[in-house]
Structure formats: structure tokens, C-alpha cells
From Swiss-Prot:
Top-rank taxon, per record: Bacteria
InterPro entries: Pept_tRNA_hydro, Pept_tRNA_hydro_CS, Pept_tRNA_hydro_sf
Function text: Hydrolyzes ribosome-free peptidyl-tRNAs (with 1 or more amino acids incorporated), which drop off the ribosome during protein synthesis, or as a result of ribosome stalling. Catalyzes the release of premature peptidyl moieties from peptidyl-tRNA molecules trapped in stalled 50S ribosomal subunits, and thus maintains levels of free tRNAs and 50S ribosomes.
PANTHER family noted in UniProt: PEPTIDYL-TRNA HYDROLASE (PTHR17224:SF1)
Family: Belongs to the PTH family.
Gene source species: Acholeplasma laidlawii (strain PG-8A)
Subcellular locations according to the entry: Cytoplasm
Name of the coding gene: pth
The entry's keywords: Cytoplasm, Hydrolase, RNA-binding, tRNA-binding
GO BP, sorted A to Z: protein quality control for misfolded or incompletely synthesized proteins; rescue of stalled ribosome
Catalytic reaction equation(s): an N-acyl-L-alpha-aminoacyl-tRNA + H2O = an N-acyl-L-amino acid + a tRNA + H(+)
Pfam families (alphabetical): Pept_tRNA_hydro (PF01195)
Name listed for the protein in its UniProt record: Peptidyl-tRNA hydrolase
Site residues, Stabilizes the basic form of H active site to accept a proton: 92
High-level lineage: Bacteria, Bacillati, Mycoplasmatota, Mollicutes, Acholeplasmatales
Length: 191
């Protein structure tokens, strides 16, 4: 069984913000799969259990704020007895150019507080992550930038990237070969 978690902040005020790119990716995946999330306050997540290419998959969004994302990830992992190496976290990255992705099997939190909390709560950094570039914040406070909404032009760049992310997720689940996914999808994509 796999666990795919998109990071973001709950609440209408955060819809379409840069920090919520993980939620945006999950919404697109759910639309593709024609399924919806259900809220489970005990697990601190909105999630669904579905099948992709015959594999059981949990797709989730934490109900907590970004900085406490580890609570939901840990609870889902323990409840469904999911191995840490079968977890994929989708998140924003200000160090990547807008619309570029980076897929890794392990690594640091890179200053991303949601990822930092997951690493702390799981007690390991050895889980998969898919970072989506939201660009730099050179002329803005970082917090204001990540909590700011995408412009129309930025959305036009991001939406094809989300399709690319879905392709990577589906291929990972169908092949169970993450090394090939990293090789194929980490190369610069033309959108």
C-alpha cells in the first residue's frame, strides 16, 4: 500500500496559494481518478483509499496547518500499516524555478517546515518527496510570498506541471520503480 500526501494549509484563504501546491496536485489527481476525500478528524486528514493500477493507495491532505503535517502522515501510516518507503509527500519549493519538479527518495527538509515536521514525527528522512517549484521570492518576504496566490500567468505555468506530476505518480505506482521515475521525471520537462 502507498500513501500520497499533498502538503498545504486548510481553509478558503489558502486556496490557490503557492504554499498549497501539494493540495492542488492532490485535487488534480483526485479529479483524474474520479474520487473524493473524506474527513477523518482522528487521523487529522481528509483522505481516500483507492486503487491505482491494482495497487491500494491512500491519497491525503492533512487537516492541520503545514507546520504540523507530520501528525496526519504518522497517523495514516500507523493506521494503515504503511512502510515509510511507500510514502510520497508532494510540496512546494522556493529554490526550484516555477513549474519545475524534483523527485527524491530521501533528503533534508530544505527549510520547508511541513517537511521538517514530517521528518521529526517519523524519525526518519527516508521517504519519497516530490517538490514542485514555486519560484523565488526575491522582492518579497518569504512568508508573504508562499502564502500569496498564484497569478494567472503562474497558474498557466503550474497547471501543465501538475499533469506531469500525475503522470509520475501513476507511473511510480504501476511500475513500483522509483529510480526510473527519478531518472525520467527529474530531467528538465518541456511544458
Amino acid at each position: 500500500m502507498k500513501l500520497i500526501v499533498g502538503l498545504g494549509n486548510p481553509g478558503k484563504q489558502y486556496v490557490q496559494t503557492r504554499h498549497n501546491i501539494g493540495f492542488i496536485a492532490i485535487d488534480k489527481l483526485l479529479s483524474y481518478l474520479n474520487t473524493e476525500l473524506k474527513v477523518d478528524s482522528k487521523l487529522q486528514a481528509a483522505y481516500t483509499k483507492t486503487k491505482i493500477e491494482g495497487e491500494d493507495v491512500i491519497i491525503a491532505k492533512p487537516l492541520t496547518y503545514m507546520n504540523l503535517s507530520g501528525d496526519a502522515v504518522t497517523k495514516l501510516m500507523n493506521f494503515y500499516k504503511i512502510d515509510v518507503e511507500d510514502i510520497l509527500v508532494i510540496l512546494d519549493d522556493t529554490a526550484l524555478p516555477l513549474g519545475k519538479i524534483r523527485i527524491r527518495q530521501t533528503g533534508s527538509h530544505g527549510g520547508q517546515n511541513g517537511l521538517k515536521d514530517i521528518i521529526n514525527k517519523l524519525g526518519t528522512k527516508d521517504f519519497k518527496r516530490l517538490r514542485i517549484g514555486i519560484g523565488e521570492h526575491a522582492h518579497m518576504d518569504k512568508v508573504d510570498y508562499v502564502l500569496g496566490k498564484f497569478s494567472t500567468n503562474e497558474l498557466n505555468t503550474i497547471l501543465p506541471t501538475i499533469e506531469y506530476v500525475n503522470d509520475a505518480i501513476i507511473e511510480w505506482i504501476s511500475t513500483n520503480n522509483f529510480n526510473n521515475i527519478m531518472t525520467k521525471y527529474n530531467t528538465p520537462q518541456t511544458l
